[in-house]
């Protein structure tokens, strides 16, 4: 907080891939805000849908037997889009979705007569929000520090199937509730999975009877070229968390896609297990209207598949930066997500280098995000190769100034 005191960049308006600050300067939004503005800024279709919903019903509780027609419609739509037979639990964002999935996993095993299955496994570099369970699952050490004792979790190396199997065996499968995995690690540095990794992980979970949770908060709704991102690996998770791109950030909404077999215990006759959990604003009517309109745009405008169509162009455009001695690696190639990692020598000798690159790019009218050991790029799905070129040029100039 102190680091940005009196130094805020005030973003005043947006249109497509562009945003403007309060001084009128235009910037290329090369991060889709915070990984979420998939359809681009200023879409009138979403604004109109939300306005119409506000005129009819702004919101009403979804607790107990209450529901709104628009929430029903969204849940039905999401269930139809899911890669497995499923039910939908709506939340207000990604962090709530992670907490919800974690609680469902633990409550599911309790309902199955296995209450000791509470341990959760995640990966180094993984990001799962900053709520209670998400903080405990964090594979980014800085996100866990300073908060005292947390929920018991185990982090394993992000690229090792052997480490996952060993962690389950070491803890005892009878104690492990679920493994949480981003299809592509996002905030931890943009690490696409090794070939066969996701498929192998699902097999390990099946053999061990452990639930597999795909955290698709960043990867969904076109970012990897499909509705939930994980479909491109040909697997059926036990749960999928989503948020961000489901509304393109126009209003806050998230949720969990829960496979039928995981949801089943909670749909028994009265007297069966109860999942006592739910955010106040879950299934908010106006937010649901935004999501429905956004999903329609993704399909109508051909944006859903853009993440996969553009992944090669984005990576190829940025890859020449790797020839700069100040760059260790350019990662990407799976969806419209990429990272330019700075060299260890540079970071050791110049700890402020990442911030300097971010600010130099900003001076050139390009917004990138510093994270991990470099900067990330994740533009709206309406971006083009020309926009990728602007990102490359801004980063090249920024690197030349170090």
Each PLM stretch: what is its role?
Residues 1-402:
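Conserved N-terminal phosphate-binding loop of PLP-dependent enzymes in the Aspartate aminotransferase
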């Amino acid at each position: 907080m102190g680091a940005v005191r009196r130094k805020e960049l005030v973003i005043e308006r947006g249109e497509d891939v562009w945003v403007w600050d309060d001084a009128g300067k235009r910037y290329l939004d090369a991060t889709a805000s915070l990984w979420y503005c998939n359809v681009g800024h200023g879409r009138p279709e979403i604004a109109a849908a939300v306005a119409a919903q506000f005129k009819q019903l702004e919101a009403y509780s979804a607790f107990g037997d209450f529901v709104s027609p628009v929430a029903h419609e969204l849940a039905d739509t999401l269930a139809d889009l899911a890669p497995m037979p499923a039910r939908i639990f709506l939340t207000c964002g990604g962090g709530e979705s992670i907490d919800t999935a974690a609680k469902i996993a633990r409550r599911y095993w309790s309902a199955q007569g296995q209450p000791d299955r509470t341990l959760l496994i995640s990966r180094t570099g993984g990001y799962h929000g900053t709520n209670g369970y998400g903080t405990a699952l964090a594979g980014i050490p800085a996100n866990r520090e300073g908060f005292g004792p947390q929920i018991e979790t185990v982090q394993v190396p992000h690229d090792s199937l052997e480490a996952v199997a060993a962690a389950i065996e070491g803890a005892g499968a009878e104690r492990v509730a679920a493994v949480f995995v981003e299809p592509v690690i996002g905030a931890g540095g943009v690490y696409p999975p090794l070939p066969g990794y996701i498929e192998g992980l699902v097999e390990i979970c099946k053999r061990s009877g452990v639930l597999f949770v795909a955290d698709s908060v960043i990867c969904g709704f076109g970012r990897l070229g499909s509705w939930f991102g994980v479909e491109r690996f040909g697997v059926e998770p036990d749960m999928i968390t989503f948020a961000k791109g489901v509304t393109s950030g126009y209003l806050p909404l998230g949720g969990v896609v829960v496979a039928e077999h995981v949801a089943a215990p909670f749909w028994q006759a009265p007297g069966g297990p109860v999942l006592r959990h739910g955010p106040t604003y879950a299934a908010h009517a106006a937010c649901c209207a935004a999501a429905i309109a956004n999903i329609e745009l993704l399909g109508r405008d051909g944006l859903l598949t853009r993440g996969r169509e553009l992944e090669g162009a984005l990576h190829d455009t940025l890859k020449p930066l790797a020839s700069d001695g100040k760059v260790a690696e350019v990662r990407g190639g799976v969806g419209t997500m990429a990272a330019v990692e700075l060299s260890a020598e540079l970071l050791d000798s110049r700890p402020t280098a990442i911030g300097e690159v971010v600010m130099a790019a900003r001076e050139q009218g390009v917004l990138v995000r510093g994270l991990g050991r470099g900067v990330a790029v994740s533009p709206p799905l309406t971006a083009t190769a020309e926009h990728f070129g602007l990102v490359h040029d801004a980063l090249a100039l920024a690197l030349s100034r170090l």
